[in-house]
Amino acid sequence: MNEHHSNNRKIDPLKSFLLDDNTPNDKNRVEIGPTLLARREWETAGLELPDLQAMRKFRWKRLTKHILDREYGGLLMFDPLNIRYATDSTNMQLWNTHNPFRAVLLCADGYMVIWDYKNSPFLSEFNPLVKEQRSGADLFYFDRGDKIGDAADVFANEVRLLISEHGNGNNRLAVDKIMLHGLRSLEALDFKLMDGEEVTEKSRSIKGIDEIKAMRCASYACEKAIYEMEQVTRSEVCNENLSENDIWSILHAENIKRGGEWIETRLLTSGPRTNPWFQECGPRIVQNNEIIAFDTDLVGAYGICVDISRTWWIGDQSPRPDMIYAMRHAHEHIMKNMEMLKPGVHMSDLTKNAHKLDEKYQVGKYSCLMHGCLLYTSPSPRDLRKS
């Protein structure tokens, strides 16, 4: 029962041991990744794949440097996206967001330990930067019941021993998101808890070469998924039997086909449901000569979030003049603001010099001028009042 198939894997001797992204050429491997469909599309597009071994090491170095710069003993992570960044390993990502059973401790000397599901320690063994696999970080009531305090004490003591050995006994510990009992148990051991999200966000603020390659690949895969969704939409709407949910399901399927993982939101609406924005995708049947608007918000290949917003006019007639003007005004807004984006530009300069929307669009405008994925920076509402 303890002998995992991963320990007995065989690789085709006629093929290279490694794929172009420097991961094992093993169809039965534990490590997830992009599909053959995605790889073929990237090759046709002339995209260069990331070196995942190098990307993982870059991220590990970034996190370790930020720990040392702040004179912390270590960084304790529970957020599954931070764990993905630190280890590139996954385990029931969405379930983990509301049942935090995984944790990673990165010590000041670079020693990294993961607490995972007890029966699946092998899920991160492909990454040599993860030195130990343990279990016991599931500090939520559904798992532990009234014994949760005892489990938290055991976990906190393990952290203490690791910091003693690999963090020089420094009790300044950065933590991102932790359950209440875990917090109390760490504080009872005299840990001074610091803001772990500040560490992880600033670590991610600078991308390495291979991360940029991964982002390009993921973005291209998302664009191909959008293309497939558009083709079906344009061919089927005239039959008046295609719902918003039907259209949205195509993006889900095409994302998964390329090795993507999930979609964060349900932002696809049609006709009168497009305004006000933020209504969620529903059963409404899309009619001929209507607008469809969506925001991908998907976690795609390599775990990269790709957030693309689009609107389509679907029909055999022309849109109304006011819709054409709104689209042209929106396009001008995007292009003018894009021109300002360059290295060294301060956030305050972006808001001060931003393209101004017409007065009639002020009430329904988006909540921020521009944003990234997972590194969310929004200018103040005062600065945005007329942008």
State where each predicted segment sits.
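Active-site neighborhoods and metal-handling regions in enzymes and metal-associated proteins
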Residues: 1-378, 382
